[in-house]
């Protein structure tokens, strides 16, 4: 929605509906907090990684970073997710690194591959947690998204903010991209700015990439060794991926943007060049292995998060678990 990032006449026309959306969502949150509507308390601490706005803000790299950081502190970690893009006939569903992305969803499969922790998907977060704990003991559970899922009680909250796009025109849906107003940041435990520091946070996440991996041969090659190619991305903010590639000196002859959680097929790429390198995100790659070509490369990224607030956040979780609170 391009008008979400400008204060156009369309946005102003939709403001009455935005007010209704905000009013209903705030009332719903208050009812959960007051205990009038029943919410679920898990037997282990829950950490929410979410955002205030619609679209790709970089939650998945943060989830992977968080899981690894907690593992390094000796904690057993599990992950739950709604599983956007999943076509499973049964929920809750345990997702492993070998799960078909069409069944498990691209992001849950990627998280399982990168962290090797148990992942469970379901729109019903309580059922996902219960199945997860039946399968493997967990000291803490990370929820990929779910900031507005107040039916699930939480112990810690992280919000990821896209430093480039911010909160768009500042309006709540449908006039703007916001699910909640920026004032919601005052009540979360950690705000991470994706890209650079901004007015909302000095805790910064940068996505570090050094090499590309061939989908067929598994060969690794430094990105600086490529001169040109084409690229596609089916993520929330494809331009960020293209800009990153260009930053390594790669001349992109063609770029293709797809919807987030796009379903890919061999037919979709029939007209793509079979000669020049073709780059994609790791999230997209998990769906493309069955029909990959030898000129296809995916680019793994690693979240680098700086700031004492992030260190303190991890320490607080570890302390909570060890104290049995």
UniProtKB/Swiss-Prot annotation:
Its EC number is 2.7.1.130. GO terms for biological process: lipid A biosynthetic process; lipopolysaccharide core region biosynthetic process. The keyword Transport does not apply. It comes from the Bacteria. Keywords: ATP-binding, Kinase, Lipid A biosynthesis, Lipid biosynthesis, Lipid metabolism, Nucleotide-binding, Transferase. ATP binds at residues 53-60. GO terms for cellular component: plasma membrane. Pathway: Glycolipid biosynthesis; lipid IV(A) biosynthesis; lipid IV(A) from (3R)-3-hydroxytetradecanoyl-[acyl-carrier-protein] and UDP-N-acetyl-alpha-D-glucosamine: step 6/6. It is an enzyme of class 2 (transferase). It catalyses: a lipid A disaccharide + ATP = a lipid IVA + ADP + H(+). One of its GO terms (molecular function) is tetraacyldisaccharide 4'-kinase activity. Transfers the gamma-phosphate of ATP to the 4'-position of a tetraacyldisaccharide 1-phosphate intermediate (termed DS-1-P) to form tetraacyldisaccharide 1,4'-bis-phosphate (lipid IVA). PANTHER family: TETRAACYLDISACCHARIDE 4'-KINASE, TETRAACYLDISACCHARIDE 4'-KINASE, MITOCHONDRIAL-RELATED. NCBIfam families: lpxK. Belongs to the LpxK family. This is Tetraacyldisaccharide 4'-kinase. It comes from Mannheimia succiniciproducens (strain KCTC 0769BP / MBEL55E).
């Amino acid at each position: 929605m391009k008008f979400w990032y400008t204060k156009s006449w369309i946005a102003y026309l939709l403001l009455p509906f935005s007010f209704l959306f905000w009013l209903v969502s705030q009332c719903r949150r208050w009812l959960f907090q007051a205990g009038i509507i029943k919410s679920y308390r898990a037997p282990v601490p829950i950490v929410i990684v979410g955002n205030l706005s619609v679209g790709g803000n970089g939650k998945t790299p943060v989830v992977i970073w968080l899981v690894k950081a907690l593992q390094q502190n000796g904690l057993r970690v599990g992950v739950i997710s709604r599983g956007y893009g999943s076509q499973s006939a049964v929920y809750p569903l345990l997702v492993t690194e070998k799960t078909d992305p069409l069944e498990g969803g691209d992001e849950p499969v990627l998280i399982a591959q990168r962290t090797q922790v148990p992942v469970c998907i379901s729109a019903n977060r309580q059922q996902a947690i219960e199945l997860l704990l039946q399968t493997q003991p967990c000291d803490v559970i990370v929820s990929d998204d779910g900031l507005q899922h107040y039916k699930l009680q939480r112990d810690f909250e992280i919000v990821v903010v896209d430093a480039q796009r911010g909160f768009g025109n500042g309006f709540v849906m449908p006039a703007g991209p916001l699910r909640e107003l920026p004032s919601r940041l005052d009540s979360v435990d950690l705000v991470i700015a994706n890209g650079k520091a901004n007015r909302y946070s000095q805790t910064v996440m940068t996505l570090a990439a050094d090499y590309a991996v061939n989908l067929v041969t598994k060969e690794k090659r430094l990105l600086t060794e490529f001169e040109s190619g084409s690229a596609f991305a089916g993520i929330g903010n494809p331009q960020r991926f293209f800009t990153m590639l260009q930053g390594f000196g790669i001349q992109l002859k063609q770029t293709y943007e797809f919807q987030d959680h796009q379903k890919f097929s061999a037919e979709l790429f029939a007209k793509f060049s079979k000669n020049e390198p073709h780059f994609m995100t790791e999230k997209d790659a998990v769906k493309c292995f069955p029909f990959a070509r030898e000129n296809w490369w995916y680019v793994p990224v690693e979240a680098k998060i700086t700031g004492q607030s992030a260190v303190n956040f991890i320490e607080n979780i570890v302390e909570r678990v060890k104290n049995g609170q």
